[in-house]
Amino acid sequence: MDVLYSLSKTLKDARDKIVEGTLYSNVSDLIQQFNQMIVTMNGNEFQTGGIGNLPIRNWNFDFGLLGTTLLNLDANYVETARNTIDYFVDFVDNVCMDEMVRESQRNGIAPQSESLRKLSGIKFKRINFDNSSEYIENWNLQNRRQRTGFTFHKPNIFPYSASFTLNRSQPAHDNLMGTMWLNAGSEIQVAGFDYSCAINAPANTQQFEHIVQLRRVLTTATITLLPDAERFSFPRVINSADGATTWYFNPVILRPNNVEVEFLLNGQIINTYQARFGTIIARNFDTIRLSFQLMRPPNMTPAVAALFPNAQPFEHHATVGLTLRIESAVCESVLADASETMLANVTSVRQEYAIPVGPVFPPGMNWTDLITNYSPSREDNLQRVFTVASIRSMLIK
């Protein structure tokens, strides 16, 4: 894997810097490195593809070295270099695709394609070794079963979940009280509602709670907490739990009271925040517990009192909500996040070449399914294919 990264890094630098008019002295070190790559690869044969619709391709390396010059690089020099660069880039692209579409239930962190296994040989270590990529660094750690650490921005840690629970219900669905939520990606939105605006509740207050368990532990997380849930701030028609009917939800938004968010690890509270909004942090956690209250306003203008009458019908429904968004965090496991395209790269290649469903990944690389059942085998394979996707993205956009 590190050899594949070093190949890609050398080719990217060569493609960017070996251009007509450049002083040879400015790129002499790069050309020496480029020539070392050619010397190492010459005389070797590789085969890629042969799975799904990914075609079989044979690769043979027999290239001349780039020479020295005292002057600027001319058009002939650059054209010779470009022909070599283009062949190598095409090779790296096909090795990456061949690796991204393969999976294994055992030792999925190790190279799975014949071409990448061959590149792992000791003779190829002479290619400019470069371990500067976070993905390569963590791949090496995971390969040795040592602790890894990925930094993610808006990590897709929450499987998609959208539903509701009713704490008070009746067949007519005209005086409901309960909680509804939407968990997806890096965000939780939860709303508590009471059609009667807590008119008969103790102290005219309804208590709500929402607990979310993560599939992986996050550490050093920066989090935004807001006293609102905008996705539940407009009228909607909702299917009943049994699917027999529908009910109408017409929210009027109040500010939540006594808001508390707890971050837990293995059942132990690590961080707690009360009535604190904006940016907060959490050291390490695998569970988030949100609790908040809907309190009937003790004093209301006539216009507000008209919204919340003391008896039915309740045409407007008192609602309070919270939004919790994980902006950045560190995780030992690889995840999809907002700043990278690794999941899209892997999925698109597998779809384009009609790769059959294997023993590890779900059909279509469905992320909700994948993260919901994030087994060690999936973790190993996902880290490997994401590492390869990061290498491919250096050359192929």
UniProtKB/Swiss-Prot annotation:
Pfam families (alphabetical): Rota_Capsid_VP6
Positions that bind Ca(2+): 266, 286
GO MF entries: host cell surface receptor binding; metal ion binding; structural molecule activity
UniProt modification remark: The N-terminus is blocked. Sumoylated with SUMO1 and SUMO2. Sumoylation of viral proteins seems to have a positive role on viral replication.
CC per GO annotation: viral envelope; viral intermediate capsid
Chief place of localization: virion
Interaction with the inner capsid protein VP2: annotated segments: 62-73
Residues annotated to bind Zn(2+): 153
UniProt entry tagged with the keyword Acyltransferase: no
Keywords: Calcium, Capsid protein, Intermediate capsid protein, Metal-binding, Ubl conjugation, Virion, Zinc
A biological process term (GO) from this entry: fusion of virus membrane with host plasma membrane
Function: Intermediate capsid protein that self assembles to form an icosahedral capsid with a T=13 symmetry, which consists of 230 trimers of VP6, with channels at each of its five-fold vertices. This capsid constitutes the middle concentric layer of the viral mature particle. The innermost VP2 capsid and the intermediate VP6 capsid remain intact following cell entry to protect the dsRNA from degradation and to prevent unfavorable antiviral responses in the host cell during all the replication cycle of the virus.
Subunit structure: Homotrimer. Interacts with the inner capsid protein VP2. Interacts with the outer capsid glycoprotein VP7. Interacts with the outer capsid protein VP5*.
Note: The VP6 trimer contains a zinc ion located at the center of the molecule. The zinc ion is not essential for either trimerization or transcription activity of the DLP. Zinc-depleted VP6 has an increased sensitivity to proteases.
Similarity-based family: Belongs to the rotavirus VP6 family.
Name of the protein: Intermediate capsid protein VP6
